[in-house]
Amino acid sequence: MEAGKITEFIDNLTIQDEMVRYKGNLYYFYGIRFDEERHLYYTSVDKFRNNINEFEREIYRYESTDMSDCLDHLLEDKYWDGKCFYEVEKFMKWVDG
């Protein structure tokens, strides 16, 4: 991952949101969150065109009763053109909002 360490990026996802640029688009990772009413952890990733004001669509969403499971799925599910996060992170640039 350009502009940061992958381990730090992943650690941050457990406490906050993060963004990356990949293939010319901006992707906003909503960190692992907990829904008190439903007693579920959840996360999602939104795709934007050039900047945070040009929302395109949600590309990923996952819910679980377990925080670690939620993070594992976020990183290992194949929603990046049939690849998982670990397979494409080397082409991503960590960016500030």
Question: Which residues does each predicted region cover?
Answer:
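Acidic, low-complexity, intrinsically disordered interaction modules
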Residues: L26-Y86
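Negatively charged, low-complexity tracts enriched in Asp/Glu with abundant Ser/Thr
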Residues: M1-Y22
